[in-house]
Each structure stands twice: as C-alpha cells, then as structure tokens.
Amino acid sequence: MTISPQPSHQQFESYQWTTESRSSQQRHGTGTPSQDGRLSAIPDPVERHVARWRSESRNSNKDKVFRNDEEFSQQDEIVNGTLTALKNDVEQTTEIIRRKQEQMRMERRQFQTEMEVNGRISIDPTDDWLAARLKAVSSDDMNQQLVKLKQDQRQNAVTDTLAALVYDVNATTEVLRRGQRGRDGEDGNKKKKEEIEYTLRLTPAPEEQIPQRPKIPEDDNMETDDYSRQYGVQMSEETDSLRRRRARSTTPRRTLHISGSPPPPAAAVCAYCSEEIDGAILTALAPNSERAQKFHTYHFMCTYCQKALNMHGTYREHDLKPYCHDCFYKLYNGLQYAPDDHQASIEKLI
C-alpha cells in the first residue's frame, strides 16, 4: 500500500486539526484511554516545533505579496517599453553622430581641395644655397612643406577674411563720411553767406597811458543856449544835470568801432558739372570759350579721347578745344587731317 505525499498546506491543516482536537479533549476531560496514553506518549519537542513552524508560516504569510497575472503583464509591458525607448534613442544618437562625422569629413575634403597652393619661390644664390643645392630633395619633404603651407593658410583663413571685411567696412565708412561732410560743407557755406562777422576795437588800448581829463569847475557859466548853438542839440535841465555829473567823473571813455568783415568769396563752380568744387581746383580754358574757367581735376578732359588732362603739365588747343598731346599730333600734325566719326560722335555728346 502506497501513500501519496500530501501538500504542505494539507499537512499543516492536519497537524492543526490534531492539535486542536487534543487540546479540546484535554479541556473537556473526554477521550479514550488509548488516546490519553497516546497523548501522554507525544514528546514536548514536537509541539514546540509545530508551534514554531506555525509562527514562521504566519510571518511569511504577512510579508508575502500576492500578484495576479495582469500585474505581471503590465510590469512586463513597462519594462519592454522602457528598453525599446532606450534602444531607439541610442540608434538616433548614433545616426546623428554618424551624419555629423560624414559632414565634417566632406567639409574637410572640400576645404583641402580649395586650398591648393600655387606660387613661385625666388632664392638668392648665396654661398650657403650653392653649397646646399646639390642635396637631394625627396617628395616627402616637398609634401611636408605643402602640408605646412596648407595648415598655415587654414589657420589664417578666418583672420584674413575678417581683416578684409574690416578694411571694406572702414573704406565704406570713410566714403560715407566724406559725402556727409560735403553736404554739411555746402550747408555751412550757405549759412556763412547769411552771417555777418563784426570786429570790436577798443580805444584807447588798456596798456596805453590814459590822459587825465581837466577838471571842470562846478560853477560853469556856459549856458544851455551856447550848447544848443555850438552842437545843434536842444538842451534841457535834465541833460544839463547829466552833463555836469559826467564832467565830474574821472572814468576814461572808450569808443566801440564796429567794422563789418567782407563777405566770404563765392564757392568755385565746375564748368563741366555745374557743382561746387570741394578740394583741388583746375583753372584752364574751357571748350568753346575764350576765357579760363574752373574745373574738377577729373572733369577737364581731352575732346577726342575723353581722358583727364590733370596729369599733364600742358595741353594742346585747336579751335577753342583742348586736346592731349597724342590726339593733337594724331589729328593736326600738318601732314594729313581728316576728322573721323569718333570725333564727330564726341562733339555731338558735348
């Protein structure tokens, strides 16, 4: 006869039922003699072990957390989602880094192709060079020199570009400043024409010795009629008292002389563009005119070739028209003269 093993919880229930039945029989005093003998035959360590086992099972049941299948599935989904998101982020970051490296490699390759060095080197034939020129120069040395030149150009590329930009900005600023100063100069000239300048002169000068005026006695017998007859001024009692007080004053008199300054000369006007000349003025015979006029240095030109004549000390004149030396000898050299179409078109433009 075989006995199948029982689960642990069934064994626990059987032990618990046996112990409870025994305790109830002892309390009520019932039971067979065989049972009493059997109870008395059970040793105390067994009960002790059973009680300890029961207490341990209770503590383990308190700490045990029961979870169903749904909770396990939700936890698996959360873990799987987190791992999937981390995997996607790592793949995207790797792709971005790869693209950046590819772009940098392409830019470096493009920069190297654009920074090719072409030039000429001149060497003075000194004794040291003559002694060292027989040495063999390998291709590696030349490549090293070229690489060094390219690196220097690559390092100084930004600096040279910024320097060129600064130079262009400064040049543009200078041009604008000159233009603004020219407009302000025109307005200033107009204002100066409207203003009048006065010069004050004090006489006598402070450093000169002031002569003492003779004292007039108070009992002056000169009548008001005498003043009126001598100076042509109608005298009254108030003017007579004022004259007497002024006569008693010893303060020297000073006279203010106001003399108007001459107006500023008119600004020179170019005979070619009819604008005021600010700067160097060129005075020469105007085309089709019998008197000299003023020009900008770049507006006095040859009638034929339309080149400025400001760089030449002299020029040639024919039929009241200025010519440079080359055009004059080409057209009017005395051997043959035939005005061409180019000169006719220039005259039409003039």
Swiss-Prot record:
Disruption phenotype: RNAi-mediated knockdown leads to disorganized actin-containing I band filaments, disorganized dense bodies in the muscles and reduced motility.
Post-translational modification: Ubiquitinated. Ubiquitination by rnf-5 leads to dissociation from muscle dense bodies during molting and is required for ecdysis.
Domain of life, per lineage: Eukaryota
Gene Ontology cellular-component annotations: focal adhesion; M band; nucleus; plasma membrane; striated muscle dense body
Transmembrane segments: none
Extent of Polar residues compositional bias: 1-37
Compositional bias segments (type: Basic and acidic residues): 45-65
Membrane topology reported for the UniProt record: Peripheral membrane protein
Organism, scientific name: Caenorhabditis elegans
Matching PROSITE patterns: LIM_DOMAIN_1, LIM_DOMAIN_2
Chain ranges of the LIM zinc-binding domain: 268-334
UniProt feature coiled coil, ranges: 83-110
Name of this protein: LIM domain-containing protein unc-95
A Pfam cross-reference name: LIM
GO molecular function: metal ion binding; protein domain specific binding
Major subcellular location class: cytoplasm
Sequence segments annotated as region (Disordered): 1-65, 177-198, 206-225, 235-262
